[in-house]
Structure formats: structure tokens, C-alpha cells
């Protein structure tokens, strides 16, 4: 009976326009909340499992390793059917001299005195199947190989088996130690019982000044030589010459066979010149492009790729790994890796340039091994403009590159920036963790308030050794520091001590288990960790810091956040007391004041 009476109230409530609005807004907010906080469950209805169809099953088999590599942070998905991708930026490869925007088929060039400019040349070679019934493709960036890989699976005939699908794999990379070389590797696998035909073509620009192309021949080998120009400031122009391997327009792949092709492109660009010097400059650029193309034609493709891959692998020996993120302003692992890849792709690598003199190389390596006074100031971990989650295109990417170089130069890392890609990686690594080299030691001066995030910095150069430093959390969510060393050259003793250096410095070893240091916070605030080759220097530090107190991290945080002030709690208590006094007064007046009603009726009253 009680429930029926309560249910009768609802129609009356809904008859009010105000109540209907409140109900509608509440329902809308519930839907939004459910979408945001149950994203993985909700999206599983739309992105359920691998891509469907014969070609989709084939693609799933071809890319099974991608998921494992993505979990390790070595790969980021650009596009994958049936799944959300984390790539929010241009699909590009570069080496500091050229940038190829694979997604938009654009070529950007730079010179010693001028930053990157967009050309009107289309560098990609397109391989289009003839007669495919269905096609599925996926693209990913491989950081340690410095390339973009696209896999396409083609269903050529009605079949129930994915094993009959034709696979086309394309690798794109701008060679790391050969700054003028762009490579597109094509591999076609045809396991079916029929001949498969492909059209080979390149896209011509629809607008702008086109490149003029001629066919050149060197020792029975043909290649295309394209020439064009780019207008820059002050009425000057940059001349661009591109030599590209000449391919057939139509290709047939026999049954049960594979086909491999490597398309080399050699790109030379001039310094800004006056229009009157075009003829002589073009002649020099063409000769340089022909010479390098001739060298490439006599090289093994495997050797060329190994050169490139080894350098990128060495670059990513250093890096940043986010293990646990507890706030919204800390960049994710993928955002960090993509940003590192972009910045390295825009930078030259003079340390691997064969024409660099031994004297210059030794000088750059000394900068890399001990970057004195880098990085000064606070950590860049939460600088969202330096670690953006998305980029609109190459133009914004180049602006980010300029911002990173400017930031590092102004924070004492000018020598690292001059060392090119290798130095830029070290500078970004030091800046993220708040690491700084001084005259005698390396210090970790991260803000104690951000240590609720767990992360690791690997491959920090100290002399010729590599230091790995991690901020980890124990079972009680309390932070501690883990340090390990990978010795590269002759054994040099390294020592470390935590904030204040009250305890005897510990000698660091190459043991896998590493060394653990507590997080101590001093007053006034000093670095959380010191690392040095000079034991006496660390022992003397304790006498020169002049500290008031040293607290454990949790004690420091407790003092920082002691709760709300006394005045607030006094006000709340006063309001509660006044409310109860007011309530007591109402009850008293009702039953005990003048004109109060009796609590119980007399028997005479009940008989009336």
C-alpha cells in the first residue's frame, strides 16, 4: 500500500516542465559519465577483436607482433582497422636534411642556412593491385628502426582461406647516416595459384610549379632526374634535384612467389641563391645526385638498411618510460616516444657523418658524455607545449622542434643541441627528469610533489657509461629511487648518495638488481640524489649544504598538506552548534512554551 502511494506521486512530478528538464539533464549527464569512465567496455562493442573478412584475417596474422612491440613502447600504431590508434600527428620520416610526409606524399628539404621548406615534389611510389576483391591495411611507426611500415592484405579471388591473400609490405625511411637518401622498400608475397598484376605509378602535383624530369643512364642502369625550385624570403630560391630509380609501369608477380624492390631517391638542395645563378647551381646539384645514385646502385640493400637501423637503435638506447601516471598533465608513454621520434627525425646526426673530422667528433662526444650545467631549471615533465598529445602537421611539428631547441639552449644545453640528434635525445632526457650536470656531479632535482608518478630514465650518459634512474612506488605507494649502471668502457667507479648525503655514498655497480635509495626531502630544498666519480666530493657535500631538516617524502608531504585551517573547522563546528540550539528552541517552544499543546490527552478528552 505504501509503495502504491509513492508511485502515484511520479506522474504529478513529471507533469511539471521544470521536473522534466531536470530529469533530461540528469539522464544526459549519466550517459556522458558512462561513456567517459567505461570507455574500454563501451568501445569493445565497436572495436571487437581483429579486423573481419579474409583480408582482415590475413592482416591480423601479419601484424601479430605489432601489439607486443606496442606494449613495450617500440611501436606506435598509425592506423589499424577495428581499433583506436594513439597516433595524433603526421606520418613522417626524416633525417635533418629531408622530411618525407608519407601520409600526404610531400617532400620537405633544408640546407645549412635555411630550415625546412615544402617542395612540390611527390616522393612516394604507389603499388596498386589490379582486380582485388577486398583490401585491408595497417600502418605503424617503428622507433628503433626509424621507419614507417605499411602492410596491405589483398583478397584476389573468392576464398575461405586467408592463406591465399596477397601481402604488400612497404617500408619508408630517410637514411640516418646518408642525409640525402630516402628509401622505399617494397615486398610482395603471392601465395595464391594465380598471377597477380600491379600498376606502379607516382603522383603528379595538381598545382604549383612542377618538377622537370629526364631519364639518365649510368652503366646500363636508368634512373629519373627531376629538377625544381622553392621560393624563399628576399626573392631568393632554393634549387632541388631528386634522382629516383626508374621502375616499370606494370608488374606481374608469379604464383607462389615473392617480389622485392627497393626504390632509392637521392635529394640535393642548394642554399638560397639569386635567380641569376640557377644554371651553374643546377649543374652541380645534378652531378652530386648522379654520383650518389651510382653508389647506391652498387650497394647491397641489406647493408644500407643495417646502417640506418643500427643508428636508430643506438639513439633509442636512451629513453623515457612512464610506468604509472596519477595526474592528467603528465604525458603518456606513447606521447613521449612519438615526440622523441619527431624531434630526432628533424635533426641531423653529425656524429655518424663520415666527413666529420676526428677532432670535431671527439669534441661532440665530450659534450654528449658530460653536458656541464645541462639541464638547469625545473623539469619539463608537465610542460604540455613540449609534449603535445597531437600535432596538426609538419608545420606545427617544426615549430615544436624550434621550441625544444630554444628551451634546451636557454637551460644550459647548447653544447648538446650542437651535437645533433644524439645530443637532443640526451637534452630531452635530462629535462624530463630534472637532471643536471654540475662541475663535479650529476644531480636529480625533481620536484617532490610529482613523485607520485612512476617512471624511468634510461641511458643517461655519464662519461662513457650509461645510467638508468627510476622513480618507483612501493606497496604503500611511497616513492623510492632505483639506480643501475651499464659500463661501456674501462671500469670507472661511480658513487651516489641521497638528499643531504648524510649516509656514506654507495658505489654503483652493473648488477641487474641495481641500487635503491630512499626519497628524502630537505629544508631548504636540495637535489634528491647525487652521482659522481669523486667520492671525496660527495663526502664533503654534507658539510656544505647547511640544512635545517631532512624528512622522509611522506613526512614532507604531510607537512605540506596538513588539512584545512583551524578557522574553517571552528566555523563549521559553530554552525552545527547554532543549528542544534535553534532546533532545540523550536522543540521547546512547541511543547514547553506559552500556548504549548499537552503531550497526552486526558481521559475526559477522549470520552468527548
Curated annotation (Swiss-Prot):
Mark the transmembrane ranges.
Answer: 564-584
Cytoplasmic side of membrane:
585-608
Q: What compartments host this protein?
A: Membrane
InterPro entries listed in its UniProt record: K2013-like (IPR018795)
The signal peptide, as residue positions, is 1-38
The entry annotates sugar attachment on 337
Which residue intervals are topologically Extracellular?
A: 39-563
GO cellular component assignments: membrane
What is the topology of this protein in the membrane according to its UniProt annotation? Single-pass type I membrane protein
One Pfam family recorded for the sequence: DUF2152
Provide this UniProt record's keywords sorted from A to Z.
Answer: Glycoprotein, Membrane, Signal, Transmembrane, Transmembrane helix
Top-level taxon: Eukaryota
Q: What is this protein called?
A: Uncharacterized protein KIAA2013 homolog
Q: Which organism is it from?
A: Xenopus tropicalis (Western clawed frog)
Amino acid at each position: 500500500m505504501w509503495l502504491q502511494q509513492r508511485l502515484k506521486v511520479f506522474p504529478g512530478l513529471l507533469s511539471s516542465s521544470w521536473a522534466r528538464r531536470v530529469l533530461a539533464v540528469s539522464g544526459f549527464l549519466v550517459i556522458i559519465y558512462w561513456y567517459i569512465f567505461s570507455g574500454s567496455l563501451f568501445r569493445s562493442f565497436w572495436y571487437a577483436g581483429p579486423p573481419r573478412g579474409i583480408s582482415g584475417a590475413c592482416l591480423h596474422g601479419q601484424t601479430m607482433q605489432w601489439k607486443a612491440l606496442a606494449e613495450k613502447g617500440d611501436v606506435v600504431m598509425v592506423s589499424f582497422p577495428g581499433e583506436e590508434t594513439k597516433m595524433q600527428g603526421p606520418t613522417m620520416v626524416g633525417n635533418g636534411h629531408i622530411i618525407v610526409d608519407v601520409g600526404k606524399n610531400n617532400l620537405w628539404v633544408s640546407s645549412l642556412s635555411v630550415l625546412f621548406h615544402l617542395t612540390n615534389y611527390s616522393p612516394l611510389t604507389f603499388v596498386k593491385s589490379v582486380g582485388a576483391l577486398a583490401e585491408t591495411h595497417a600502418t605503424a611507426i617503428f622507433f628503433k628502426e626509424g621507419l614507417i611500415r605499411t602492410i596491405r592484405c589483398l583478397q584476389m579471388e573468392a576464398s575461405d582461406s586467408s592463406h591465399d591473400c596477397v601481402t604488400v609490405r612497404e617500408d619508408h625511411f630517410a637514411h640516418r647516416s646518408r642525409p640525402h637518401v630516402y628509401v622505399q622498400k617494397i615486398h610482395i608475397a603471392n601465395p595464391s595459384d594465380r598471377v597477380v598484376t600491379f600498376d606502379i605509378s607516382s603522383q603528379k602535383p595538381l598545382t604549383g610549379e612542377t618538377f622537370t624530369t629526364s631519364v639518365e643512364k649510368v652503366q646500363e642502369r636508368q634512373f629519373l632526374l627531376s629538377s625544381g625550385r622553392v621560393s624563399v624570403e628576399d626573392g631568393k630560391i632554393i634549387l632541388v634535384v631528386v634522382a629516383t630509380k626508374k621502375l616499370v609501369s606494370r608488374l606481374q608477380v608469379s604464383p607462389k612467389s615473392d617480389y622485392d624492390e627497393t626504390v632509392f631517391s637521392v635529394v640535393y638542395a642548394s642554399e638560397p641563391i639569386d635567380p641569376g645563378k640557377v644554371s651553374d647551381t643546377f649543374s652541380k646539384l645534378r652531378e652530386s645526385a648522379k654520383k650518389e645514385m651510382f653508389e647506391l646502385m652498387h650497394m647491397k640493400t641489406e647493408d644500407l638498411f643495417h646502417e640506418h637501423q643500427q643508428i636508430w637503435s643506438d639513439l633509442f638506447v636512451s629513453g623515457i618510460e612512464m610506468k604509472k601516471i596519477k595526474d592528467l598533465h603528465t604525458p603518456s608513454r606513447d606521447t613521449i616516444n612519438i615526440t622523441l621520434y619527431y624531434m630526432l627525425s628533424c635533426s641531423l646526426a653529425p656524429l655518424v657523418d663520415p666527413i666529420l673530422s676526428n677532432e670535431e667528433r671527439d669534441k661532440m662526444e665530450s659534450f654528449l658524455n658530460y653536458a656541464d650545467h645541462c639541464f638547469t631549471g625545473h623539469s619539463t615533465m608537465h610542460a604540455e607545449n613540449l609534449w603535445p598529445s597531437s600535432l596538426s602537421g609538419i608545420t606545427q611539428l617544426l615549430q615544436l622542434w624550434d621550441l625544444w631547441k630554444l628551451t634546451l639552449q636557454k637551460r644550459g644545453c647548447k653544447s648538446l643541441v650542437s651535437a645533433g640528434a644524439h645530443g637532443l635525445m640526451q637534452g630531452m632526457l635530462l629535462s624530463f627528469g630534472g637532471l643536471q650536470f654540475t662541475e663535479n656531479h650529476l644531480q636529480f632535482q625533481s620536484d617532490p610533489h610529482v613523485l607520485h608518478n612512476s617512471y624511468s630514465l634510461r641511458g643517461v650518459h655519464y662519461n662513457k657509461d650509461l645510467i638508468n634512474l627510476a622513480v618507483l612506488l612501493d606497496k604503500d605507494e611511497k616513492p623510492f629511487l632505483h639506480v643501475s649502471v651499464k659500463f661501456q668502457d674501462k671500469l670507472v667507479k661511480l658513487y651516489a648518495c641521497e638528499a643531504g648525503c648524510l649516509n656514506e655514498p654507495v658505489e654503483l655497480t652493473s648488477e641487474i638488481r641495481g641500487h635503491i635509495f630512499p626519497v628524502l626531502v630537505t629544508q631548504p630544498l636540495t637535489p634528491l640524489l647525487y652521482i659522481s666519480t669523486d667520492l671525496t666530493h660527495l663526502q664533503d657535500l654534507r658539510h656544505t649544504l647547511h640544512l635545517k631538516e631532512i624528512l622522509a617524502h611522506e613526512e614532507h608531504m604531510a607537512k605540506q598538506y596538513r588539512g584545512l585551517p583551524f578557522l574553517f573547522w571552528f566555523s563549521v563546528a559553530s554552525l552545527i552548534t547554532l543549528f542544534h540550539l535553534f532546533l532545540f528552541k523550536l522543540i521547546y517552544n512547541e511543547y514547553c512554551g506559552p500556548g504549548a499543546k499537552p503531550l497526552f490527552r486526558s481521559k475526559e478528552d477522549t470520552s468527548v
